[in-house]
Amino acid sequence: MLFVSAIIDYAGETATHIVEKIKNGDKHLKEKFIKDYIPFILNIVSSFYSSKTGDLKSSDEYSIGLMAFNEAIEKFDVNKSKSFLKFAEMVIKKRMIDYFRKTSSIGRKEIPFSYFNSNNETEFRKKINNLDIEEEFNSYEFICELRDFSKKLESFGLSINNLPDYMPKHKDSREMCINIAKKIVENKSIFDKLKTKKYIQMKELSKIIDVHPKTVERNRAFIICLCILFDNDYGNFKSYLNKIF
């Protein structure tokens, strides 16, 4: 998420235009630009900062964020990216992910789960950090997919950290839920009602699939998770979930 002060008072110029001037040789403007955008950098870095007592500005994370912002200025190409701030956000996040890979004391590619959800002590975090997921975490798209999925779950009052608890233990039950979710997503009326009103229309659903209302209610959370997955192009995340479930 971009910081609210995305446009600073440079006579009405956008960050992208400022960076173009800097790249044309205005080094003094570069120093002022970085200083003015420290709140923007802090906003991104804070998502990765797990300490509750330490000073963020004295942390390694902050230093990495500053270096990444400078790197973004040096590498930005207006012909490839129209928005400098979006490009800078991507570079900072990538560098933070690289940092947590390298500093993991147990050799896993572990990223602080607070980046996706405020609750750290969960079974799902254990499952994620105990798997070898280097290939998936190498993809910035995976991080974006996971974060987006988490936000969509929260809109239903669900948490990504409880995902393993939502899943039925038996394979046949999981397959049944998959079938139900597919039917819901395929039916525009039922699915629109689920997205807007946050409930499943059992009367309408019973017309297209033979399932008991209690079964749907018992597995409501998992069915909603599946509906979100089927409705979105989470290629990396779906591949990763196969390793968990």
From Swiss-Prot:
Its main location: cytoplasm. Negatively regulated by the anti-sigma-I factor RsgI5. Binding of the polysaccharide substrate to RsgI5 may lead to the release and activation of SigI5. It comes from Acetivibrio thermocellus (strain ATCC 27405 / DSM 1237 / JCM 9322 / NBRC 103400 / NCIMB 10682 / NRRL B-4536 / VPI 7372). GO terms for molecular function: DNA binding; sigma factor activity. Induction: Up-regulated in the presence of xylan. InterPro entries: RNA_pol_sigma-I, RNA_pol_sigma70_r2, RNA_pol_sigma_r2. This is RNA polymerase sigma factor SigI5. GO terms for cellular component: cytoplasm. It comes from the Bacteria. Interacts with RsgI5. The gene is sigI5. GO terms for biological process: DNA-templated transcription initiation. It is found in: Cytoplasm. Belongs to the sigma-70 factor family. SigI subfamily. Sigma factors are initiation factors that promote the attachment of RNA polymerase to specific initiation sites and are then released. This sigma factor is involved in regulation of cellulosomal genes via an external polysaccharide-sensing mechanism. Keywords: Cytoplasm, DNA-binding, Sigma factor, Transcription, Transcription regulation. Residues 202-221 bind DNA. Pfam families: Sigma70_r2. A motif (Polymerase core binding) lies at residues 60-73.
